[in-house]
Amino acid sequence: MKKWGVGFTLLLASTSILAKDIQLLNVSYDPTRELYEQYNKAFSAHWKQETGDNVVIRQSHGGSGKQATSVINGIEADVVTLALAYDVDAIAERGRIDKNWIKRLPDNSAPYTSTIVFLVRKGNPKQIHDWNDLIKPGVSVITPNPKSSGGARWNYLAAWGYALHHNNNDQAKAQDFVKALFKNVEVLDSGARGSTNTFVERGIGDVLIAWENEALLATNELGKDKFEIVTPSESILAEPTVSVVDKVVEKKDTKAVAVAEAYLKYLYSPEGQEIAAKNFYRPRDADVAKKYDDAFPKLKLFTIDEVFGGWAKAQKDHFANGGTFDQISKR
């Protein structure tokens, strides 16, 4: 059985780095290792065919918030592929990315989407069917820490949105619901892959709140005889976003800028969208989405803009110091 590494990793798209090679560092969030391992090989082959140049792509993975902080603090990322727009905005506010980054690529620079589902043990012994089951006594929940993990922030907001919709948009009742949920959380890892390892490898918890792609990967990689996915009645549309880190690539040369831009644009190509779908992300391309229609369950999806007024407001209200997460975390 494959062990999934946790923390900061560097994956090379080539076994050797030659002086004439173009080097690219993609700083990404936690559960995209498999996606970009495949995508980097495809893009390198595409770029070689188009230009004759070799591109060597390195990867860094971790909780999205921590990764954004690393870029702010000086890690020389050429591109970022993070869990949510707020983390890219945080880098832009420090002047390392153009503030209009979100408009540079289609679909608000989110080339694929996902949502939040539950992974349970085979047979679903605790009978987890929807969000309300996560607050029952005796249910052990695994989710990452929203302070460091982008996926955890999506998890949190998905639960909050569900609670609002089932309590006439009463914010106080939604806060009580999410507080009850977090009282059942047994382990708060720093990132989504760490939480998957806690649930899958260490055998802790009854239910993992997870990215849909991570849950599908776990069942396909580790066997459907061990785990099963529960799709809730509604969840949030999760939109991971991408950007060139302007201040880094512009220090190099025009070729570095061109490669970084092409690297992200190719995510929208038919091949890029196929790779995303094969790695259990919901593709944007209509033709590719139709091909993989049966792979992704239908459910009611709400957006962060609809329910929370966008990421800036959600971050301030829920995840900033003194926000609702801090309030409900007080034991």
Regions inferred by a protein language model and the residue ranges of each:
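Short beta-strand->loop
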Residues: 27-29, 120-122, 140-167, 184-185, ...
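N-terminal signal peptide c-region/cleavage motif recognized by signal peptidases
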Residues: 14-16
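Bacterial N-terminal signal peptides that target proteins for export
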Residues: 1-8
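Ligand-binding pocket segment of bilobal, Venus flytrap-like solute-binding proteins
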Residues: 166-233
